[in-house]
């Protein structure tokens, strides 16, 4: 059997951004997040939601979805906007942006992040 050389396959990570229109703004949403970025998203979510040895489910939900927006979209936020993440979350959630981002990420990709997070919480 002939061997195929990996380098000759010229592959790279396929994030395949999908463009959506949200309130007249074009937003790109990645369809695949590289594994290191998935790890970072899950770990930051867990670290920020841990209170006295217990994961606060409200904060876990908030940070998970905020970091989903930060990492899967091309939306940029200033440091000042990120200072009050609860307020930022409320603005994004109440205006439907988080729902739109979730709808436009492949279900398998979204579910895999939850699996990783739940598995790490059980350790």
Task: Name each model-derived stretch.
Residues 35-123:
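Short, surface-exposed, charged amphipathic helix/loop patches that serve as local interaction elements
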Residues 2-48:
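N-terminal "first-domain core" detector
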């Amino acid at each position: 059997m002939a061997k195929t050389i990996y380098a000759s396959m010229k592959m790279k990570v396929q994030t395949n951004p999908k463009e959506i229109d949200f309130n007249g703004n074009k937003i790109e949403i990645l369809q695949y997040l590289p594994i290191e970025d998935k790890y970072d998203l899950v770990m930051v979510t867990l670290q920020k939601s841990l209170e006295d040895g217990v994961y606060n489910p409200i904060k876990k939900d908030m940070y998970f979805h905020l970091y989903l927006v930060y990492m899967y979209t091309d939306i940029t936020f200033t440091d000042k906007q990120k200072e009050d993440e609860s307020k930022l979350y409320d603005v994004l959630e109440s205006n439907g942006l988080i729902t739109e981002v979730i709808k436009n990420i492949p279900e398998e990709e979204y579910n895999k992040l939850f699996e990783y997070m739940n598995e790490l919480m059980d350790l």
